[in-house]
């Protein structure tokens, strides 16, 4: 038991609130349920990177929008008697509790999703507990490091531009001030390493392993999540080291799509999602300012979406359409869920607003207050229905295998 308040260091909140996290998950489940439960669609789903952000939302839509059995893989820190674990641990515990209450199969693996050990354990569980096959594999890993399974070598990714140093207006989120951020370009090695960590290699290893073990159902699909963003963030993102990794992901999708079409009459896509507040996005310089602006503009236009709305739209309007029609894809075969964010009217408004923002008018011109609240929400804080001065149980156990 502990009384827990937020402690923010840099772009990380070092504390989490178990009750707040549980209520966040409950709200996401309710949002999905409101759209109705479908009888068709995926029924046995593996989510790699299932504990927060888009991966968690994908697991929630599968379970509570389509009554699917789910297996989730993630790397989180459990809580102890005296110390809280990570938000993803409590998110997953809450998901497990609500899924089991519905009579759905829910199992989780806490370990390194980049490891062969994790793949072997997943295959064993699919064979022994999930009827032998899965029909959807969601790949949603966001990690700054990857340990290569063959050699044990640890590779790190770099959030850097390519070629030129990147200079831009940004928010110092610790002081709530507007600053000039400057980031030196990535070296060739850093670019290559970023592709190794965040590109399609591990996704390919997963699908190869699952296909090799014959645990992919007829018609099985796989989706990996990506972000392209607007040209405002391109120097640091799409045209930076991370963009190279995401282009590698695109190329991997084309290979996997062919493979799955040939082997199980299935398919693979990259899904390009909109920018949202996640632990991953808050680490990207310029993102907090861009998010604060684009949220305000999209809210004014009535087209703002959170993580759960995006995934509900991906499943219901793209992958598993009620009319059975194939999903709309772009010229690279990608599912585009960033279509509303990238509308001309939204981006033009962003570009007009960008040079006007100062420390003095930051809260007035943008939804930076909303950004800050959503950031703390990720860790279970800033909820009106939680008393943060009360003791809360931190040692939460659930149906999770520790690797």
Curated annotation (Swiss-Prot):
Its EC number is 1.3.1.9. InterPro entries: Eno_Rdtase_FAD-bd_dom (IPR024906), Enoyl-CoA_Rdtase_cat_dom (IPR024910), FabV-like_NADH_b (IPR050048), Trans-2-enoyl-CoA_reductase (IPR010758). It catalyses: a 2,3-saturated acyl-[ACP] + NAD(+) = a (2E)-enoyl-[ACP] + NADH + H(+). GO terms for molecular function: enoyl-[acyl-carrier-protein] reductase (NADH) activity; NAD binding; trans-2-enoyl-CoA reductase (NADH) activity. Substrate binds at residue 227. It comes from the Bacteria. Pfam families: Eno-Rase_FAD_bd, Eno-Rase_NADH_b, Enoyl_reductase. Pathway: Lipid metabolism; fatty acid biosynthesis. It is an enzyme of class 1 (oxidoreductase). The active site is at residue 237. PANTHER family: ENOYL-[ACYL-CARRIER-PROTEIN] REDUCTASE [NADH] (PTHR37480:SF1). Involved in the final reduction of the elongation cycle of fatty acid synthesis (FAS II). Catalyzes the reduction of a carbon-carbon double bond in an enoyl moiety that is covalently linked to an acyl carrier protein (ACP). Monomer. This is Enoyl-[acyl-carrier-protein] reductase [NADH]. It comes from Pseudomonas putida (strain GB-1).
């Amino acid at each position: 038991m502990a009384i827990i308040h937020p402690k923010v260091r840099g772009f990380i909140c070092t504390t989490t609130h178990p009750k707040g996290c549980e209520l966040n998950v409950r709200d996401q489940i309710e949002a999905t349920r409101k759209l109705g439960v479908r009888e068709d669609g995926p029924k046995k789903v593996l989510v790699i990177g299932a504990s927060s952000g888009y991966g968690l939302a994908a697991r929630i839509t599968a379970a509570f929008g389509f009554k699917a059995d789910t297996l989730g893989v993630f790397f989180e820190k459990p809580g102890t008697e005296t110390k809280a674990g990570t938000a993803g641990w409590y998110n997953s515990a809450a998901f497990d509790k609500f899924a089991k209450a519905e009579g759905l199969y829910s199992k989780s693996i806490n370990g390194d999703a980049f490891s062969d050990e994790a793949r072997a354990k997943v295959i064993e569980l699919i064979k022994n507990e999930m009827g032998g096959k899965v029909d959807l594999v969601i790949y949603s890993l966001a990690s700054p490091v990857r340990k290569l399974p063959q050699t044990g070598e640890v590779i790190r990714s770099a959030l850097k531009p390519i070629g030129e140093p990147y200079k831009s207006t940004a928010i110092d989120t610790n002081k709530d001030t507007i600053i000039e951020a400057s980031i030196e370009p990535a070296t060739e090695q850093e670019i290559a390493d970023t592709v190794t960590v965040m590109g399609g290699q591990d996704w390919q290893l997963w699908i190869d392993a699952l296909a090799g073990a014959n645990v992919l159902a007829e018609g099985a699909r796989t989706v990996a999540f990506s972000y392209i963003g607007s040209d405002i963030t391109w120097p640091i993102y799409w045209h930076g080291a991370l963009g190279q990794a995401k282009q590698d992901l695109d190329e991997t999708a084309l290979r996997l799509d062919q493979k799955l079409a040939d082997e199980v009459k299935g398919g693979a896509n990259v899904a390009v999602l909109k920018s949202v507040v996640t632990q991953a996005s808050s680490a990207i310089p310029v993102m907090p300012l861009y998010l604060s602006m684009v949220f305000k503009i999209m809210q004014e236009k009535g087209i703002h979406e959170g993580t759960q709305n995006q995934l509900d739209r991906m499943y219901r309007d793209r992958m598993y359409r009620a009319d059975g029609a194939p999903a709309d894809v772009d010229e690279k075969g990608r599912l585009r869920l960033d279509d509303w964010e990238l509308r001309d009217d939204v981006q033009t408004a962003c570009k007009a607003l960008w040079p006007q923002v100062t420390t003095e008018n930051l809260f007035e011109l943008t939804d930076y207050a909303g950004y800050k609240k959503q950031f703390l929400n990720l860790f279970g804080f800033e909820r009106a229905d939680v008393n943060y001065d009360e003791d809360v149980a931190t040692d939460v156990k659930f149906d999770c295998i520790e690797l």
